[in-house]
Regions:
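A structural boundary/capping signal
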Residues: 1-168
């Protein structure tokens, strides 16, 4: 079942659709001002999305299959950049799984004994890969967030996620 979802996700490339309908395959200087969150159908049709868009498509697909899941936003607040990642963790029986498509290095499905152990592993990978272990733990947060409104911009997406439940 989850492999069917991954097969659908494998058609999606990393990048974003800007406000003018242009596709960008790299995060460029226009991202902050021109990004808009796509709906799952837009992501499917455009075959492009950053992690934020891809998780919304995953949300839609997991929901259709009635698989219990949560979505998370990890962010590191610093003066010049604020790296983020969104991801989905689902539960089947007593096991938890990290479903990852957009972060290519970790693409796949990983099994954990608890949701907390999954969150700790993802946090460690984010610190190692995105922050090069050079960070202040008081600036790193993970929020569990609900389905956002599609079409919102970057700051609106940040605010939506930050209004979720702070879990780490």
């Amino acid at each position: 079942m989850e492999n069917d979802i991954m097969n659908i996700m494998n058609d999606i490339k990393y990048g974003y659709l800007d406000l003018n309908g242009n596709i960008h395959y790299v995060i460029d200087e226009d991202f902050d001002s021109k990004y808009k969150l796509q709906s799952p159908n837009e992501t499917l049709n455009n075959k492009v999305g950053v992690c934020w868009d891809q998780v919304e498509l995953e949300r839609y697909l997991f929901d259709k299959k009635n698989i219990k899941f949560n979505t998370y936003f990890i962010v590191y607040y610093s003066d010049n950049i604020c790296p983020t990642h969104t991801f989905l963790i689902y539960k089947i029986d007593n096991d938890y799984y990290w479903f990852e498509h957009s972060w290519e290095k970790y693409r796949g499905i990983r099994k954990y004994s608890s949701e907390n152990s999954a969150l700790n592993d993802i946090k460690e990978k984010f610190i190692n890969d995105e922050l090069s272990n050079n960070y202040d733990d008081t600036n790193l947060f993970i929020f569990k967030y609900s389905k956002p409104r599609y079409g919102i911009n970057l700051l609106e997406f940040y605010h939506h996620c930050e209004n979720g439940e702070k879990v780490k």
